[in-house]
Each structure stands twice: as structure tokens, then as C-alpha cells.
Amino acid sequence: MRVAFAGTPEFAATVLRGLLGSGHEVGLVISQPDAPRGRGRRTASPPVALLAREAGLPLLQPASISEAAGEISRHDALVVAAYGQILRPDTLYAARHGAYNVHASLLPAYRGAAPVERAIMDGERETGVTVIRMDEGLDTGPVALQRRVPIPPDMTGGELADLLARVGAEALVEVLDRLESGTLNLTRQDSSRASYAPRITRQDQEIDWSRDARRVHDQVRALSPHIGARTRHPEVEGPLKIWRTRVHREAGRELAPGELRAGDGRLFVGCESGVVEILELQLPGGRRLGAAEFLRGHSLTGALRR
């Protein structure tokens, strides 16, 4: 089949790589425009655009994907993975077989923009990938294929996204194979079972140390390595970012929620139930440091707070 591909971040680039290794032809790639990125705010291309140029594929980066509807109509299907815009009907139905989306959850669970982070933050032990034929709703289209993936207890959001992208690429190729052969079956979603995964906000980043240690750990790993969970200390101007933690299971005295204890190059924080060990953190304007390196140059006493 000849397909058009729309996607933007690294998740989508991984899906595109898998598609390029299949027997299907990618006739067009659509990605978001170049934009200022990183701490230096230098203009840079998104990962999908970089991959398209590297592979010599036709590339469009319109302000609105609707501008590409005419080009999309020359393809058998439009494939979407984390593109970053809601598609209007003129784009959804432009290709001969419509549009198919690779979504990083087991729909109808976790519809929306942040399914990977939300699943980990909720302590889910399993997630997956769903390929749907897109309709005009938010991740509401009929299911073409699902693949289940376990979530290990210490896996980060970045690690899970990478895994789901690889699984999603394989699932997408299988869907296109079935679509081409006329054997693809679609199943309606049960919207009564739907849950939602809105974009991560600043409030979602703030650590509440009065929660259970496992929930705090899940929040930190969900937001690592790109977003970061945040906390504050009276002696530090601005938020501290916490990048890696583990639930501390060794015997020791209980710590009050937010209370700090440092020793032997290790840093512990009390929670409502249990203790979290901070493994990697970052001061405002600084670089990420392991706990031992951080403690060699800094001293934190007292308590952390929201």
C-alpha cells in the first residue's frame, strides 16, 4: 500500500522506522513545523522530519495538516502517530481507506495526549498499543488491532514510550497488511469503559509527599526522563526536579512526610506511608546529579514541600 505518514516526536519516528522496513510505500511524511527547542531555544526539526530527510522522503511541515489534504488524497491510507493536531474531516477521509492512528494505550482506556505517563502515575501494571481507524472523536474510532504490554514496577515513562513505539510499529504493519488483503476487521469501542489522559500540567509535576511512597515513585518514573517531577525546599530558590527514585525497603526509623535524611551518599524522603530514596535530582539551572555526587557539593536538611 502507498501511505502518507503524519507524526512528530521520537515515538512517531520509531513507528515510521518500522513502517519503512515493511513492504508498504511511504509516499509522504507530514510533521509539525520546526520550532525553538531545548534550553538554548534554538530552532530545530522534530524527530520525524529529521528521519524523513535522512530517508529521502517527501516532507511537508504545514501549520495545519488540512493544508496537506490534497497530497494525502493521492494515497491509500493516512497513518498517524503522535502528530499533535486534531484532524478535521477533510483530512481524516482524504485517503482512499481513511486514517489509522497508533495510540499508546489499550483503548478505550487513557484516551488523550498523555496515555503513557498517566498509566504509570496510576500504578497500572499493564498497558499496550491500539491501532484504530480514526473518526471525528478523540481516540474513539473502531479498533483494528491491540497489543498488550506489561509495565515493570521501575520502568520510566521514556522507556515505556520507546517500547510501545516498537510494538506499535509492528501492529501498524500488520493492520496495513490486513487492509491491503481485505481481511481487516474493526471492533467498536465500548465508550462506557473510557478513561482519559489529559496533557501533563505543572500541577501534575508537583510531588505531594503526604501520599504513599509507591505513588510518589510512580509519579517520578512516569515523568522521567523528559518532564520531571518537582518539589521545593526552603533553602533553594525555585523547584528541584526529581528524576529517579526507588521505594526504600530497608529497616530504619520512620520519616515524616517530606522529611529528609542523608547519609553515606544516599538521600531519603519520608512519605505518608513508607520512604522514597532519591537517586537523581537537579537544582534550578543545574545539571542532573546522582544523589552521592549531589551530596558532595550540597546539603539539604529539614523537609521538602510542594
UniProtKB/Swiss-Prot annotation:
PROSITE patterns: GART. Gene3D superfamilies: 3.40.50.12230. One of its GO terms (cellular component) is cytosol. GO terms for molecular function: methionyl-tRNA formyltransferase activity. Its EC number is 2.1.2.9. The keyword Protein biosynthesis applies. It catalyses: L-methionyl-tRNA(fMet) + (6R)-10-formyltetrahydrofolate = N-formyl-L-methionyl-tRNA(fMet) + (6S)-5,6,7,8-tetrahydrofolate + H(+). Attaches a formyl group to the free amino group of methionyl-tRNA(fMet). The formyl group appears to play a dual role in the initiator identity of N-formylmethionyl-tRNA by promoting its recognition by IF2 and preventing the misappropriation of this tRNA by the elongation apparatus. Belongs to the Fmt family. This is Methionyl-tRNA formyltransferase. It comes from Rubrobacter xylanophilus (strain DSM 9941 / JCM 11954 / NBRC 16129 / PRD-1).
